[in-house]
Regions:
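Short catalytic/ligand-binding loop motif for oxyanion handling, primarily in non-cytosolic enzymes
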Residues: 15-19, 23-25, 133-137, 162-163, ...
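C-terminal cap/substrate-recognition subdomain and adjoining C-terminal extension
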Residues: 180-182, 199-207, 211-224
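Acidic, divalent-metal-coordinating active-site segment for phosphoryl/phosphodiester hydrolysis
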Residues: 170, 190-203
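Conserved SAM-binding loop
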Residues: 187-188, 207
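Glycine-centered short loops/turns at secondary-structure junctions
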Residues: 119-121, 202
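Substrate-recognition "cap/lid" segment bordering the active-site pocket of phosphatases
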Residues: 132-184
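N-terminal helical cap/lid subdomain that shapes the substrate entry/recognition surface
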Residues: 2-108, 112, 119
Length: 224
């Protein structure tokens, strides 16, 4: 097995809870905004997908900060359901505050895992389908920025493609950001199809199913 130089992580569902799936739960889940305001299940799912498509590939720019993008996101959400006349507790600021309530580590042992990998001399990176504002809240609130160099953070909103793209742009960008060959990277994701795509591009893949399983799989690659 070749030398492993970098471990690249997805964010939602691996390092932090997936904000979208809890704040705007999919059809199979309950909770979040949908239940709090009695919104139609299918409509919330539809609007969530539309807004994801609109912001997943939209980067922060010199004239548009991530906070402005976040406010624009919730303004569009409110307009769709209440046409500028939302009920009490459904303002832009209310939804931003609610977002923070759903920003949590997947497991409290995540920081120790990252520290352990750093102590072994491994470079850590991120490859995530994420918008700018939820990523900033996840990494800022959970104090994860210290583990990842800015150049090693690859997001769909910055690359302009998702991990499902046929061109493998996200995986190529991640390997390039680490300045190592694909074969020297381990990629960790909670979605099996993303892991399979990373492997098809030459990376080692780990399908995340829990912290203990992840540690065992990492040790298998690093100590094998």
């Amino acid at each position: 097995m070749g030398l492993i130089e970098a471990v690249i992580f997805d964010v939602g569902g691996v390092l932090a809870e997936d904000v979208w799936e809890h704040l705007l739960p999919c059809r199979k889940k309950s909770g979040g905004i949908r239940d709090q305001f009695g919104l139609d299940r299918d409509q919330v799912h539809k609007v969530g997908l539309l807004l994801w498509a609109a912001f997943a590939h939209t980067p922060e720019g010199q004239r548009t900060t991530w906070r402005e993008l976040e406010r624009r996101y919730w303004d569009l959400f409110i307009r769709f359901f209440w046409d500028r006349s939302p009920p009490q507790g459904a303002s832009i600021d209310d939804f931003i505050h609610m977002t923070d309530e759903y920003v949590r580590l997947v497991d409290p042992g995540i920081p120790a895992l990252l520290e352990g990998l750093q102590s072994r001399g491994l470079n850590l990176g991120v490859c995530s389908n994420n918008n700018e504002f939820w990523f900033r809240r996840q990494f800022g609130n959970l104090k994860l920025f210290s583990y990842f160099p800015p150049a090693g953070i690859v997001l769909s909103c910055r690359v302009g493609f998702s991990k499902s793209s046929a061109g493998y742009e996200m995986f190529d960008a991640a390997a390039s950001a680490m300045n190592v060959a694909h074969s020297s990277c381990i990629f960790v994701d909670d979605r099996k199809d993303n892991v399979e795509r990373a492997e098809a591009r030459g990376m080692k893949g780990i399908h995340f199913r829990g912290l203990s399983q992840l540690q065992e799989s990492l040790n298998g690659f690093l100590d094998g």
